[in-house]
Amino acid sequence: MKTQRDGPSLGRWSLVLLLLGLVMPLAIVAQVLSYQEAVLRAIEGINQRSSDANLYRLLDLDPRPTMDGDPDTPKPVSFTVKETVCPRTTQKSPEDCDFKEDGLVKRCVGTVTLNQARDSFDISCDKDNRRFARLGKFFRKVKKKIGGGLKKIGQKIKDFLGNLVPRTAS
């Protein structure tokens, strides 16, 4: 008659299960992407779906919003990409490509998940018109400063000419 000592002991199975329990959470944690890694993956997807001739590369990443800890919950993202000199057909990573001088700049918004296994994103990109808005703001400031300066100069000339008029003694 066999006893428990002849087969695998309960202690060994407990040890194996304990080790598996310790290893599994590490494997799950390793699959969670950082905010920036998730955005870079989304840019890879944008480049694959794009009909433009060249790859796009991250130009500016807006600050990470406060988020919950669930990697499966879609996280809001917003960033700017710029056209590079590398053609879409290249095997290079966009990060290895230089930005194209006067390349197209796109503003992208949407959501990404940080769970590497799900690897989902919903991003839309439009031509970035913010730089033109900033240019308009710059010209308004210049106009205001020049206008104010001209008024001061005009007032000083008026005062100077007013002092040149001979005064009559009464």
UniProtKB/Swiss-Prot annotation:
Cleaved signal peptide residues: 1-30
Localization of this protein: Secreted; Vesicle
Gene Ontology molecular function terms on file: lipopolysaccharide binding
PTM field: Proteolytically cleaved by proteinase PRTN3 into antibacterial peptide LL-37. Proteolytically cleaved by cathepsin CTSG and neutrophil elastase ELANE.
TM spans (from-to): none
Alphabetical list of InterPro entries matching this protein: Cathelicidin-like (IPR001894), Cathelicidin_CS (IPR018216), Cathlecidin_C (IPR022746), Cystatin_sf (IPR046350)
Region (Active core): 150-162
Disulphide bonds in the chain: 86-97, 108-125
Chief place where the protein resides: secreted
The entry's keywords: Antibiotic, Antimicrobial, Cleavage on pair of basic residues, Disulfide bond, Immunity, Innate immunity, Secreted, Signal
Gene3D superfamilies in the cross-refs: 3.10.450.10
Keyword hit for tRNA processing: no
Domain of life according to the entry: Eukaryota
UniProt GO BP: antimicrobial humoral immune response mediated by antimicrobial peptide; defense response to Gram-negative bacterium; defense response to Gram-positive bacterium; innate immune response; neutrophil activation
GO terms under cellular component: extracellular space; vesicle
Propeptide span(s): 31-131
Function according to Swiss-Prot or TrEMBL: Antimicrobial protein that is an integral component of the innate immune system. Binds to bacterial lipopolysaccharides (LPS). Acts via neutrophil N-formyl peptide receptors to enhance the release of CXCL2. Postsecretory processing generates multiple cathelicidin antimicrobial peptides with various lengths which act as a topical antimicrobial defense in sweat on skin. The unprocessed precursor form, cathelicidin antimicrobial peptide, inhibits the growth of Gram-negative E.coli and E.aerogenes with efficiencies comparable to that of the mature peptide LL-37 (in vitro).
The record's note on its domains: The cathelin-like domain (CLD), which is the propeptide part, does not seem to exhibit auto-inhibitory function, as it does not inhibit the antibacterial activity of antibacterial peptide LL-37.
Similarity comment: family membership: Belongs to the cathelicidin family.
Descriptive protein name: Cathelicidin antimicrobial peptide
Source organism of the structure: Chlorocebus aethiops
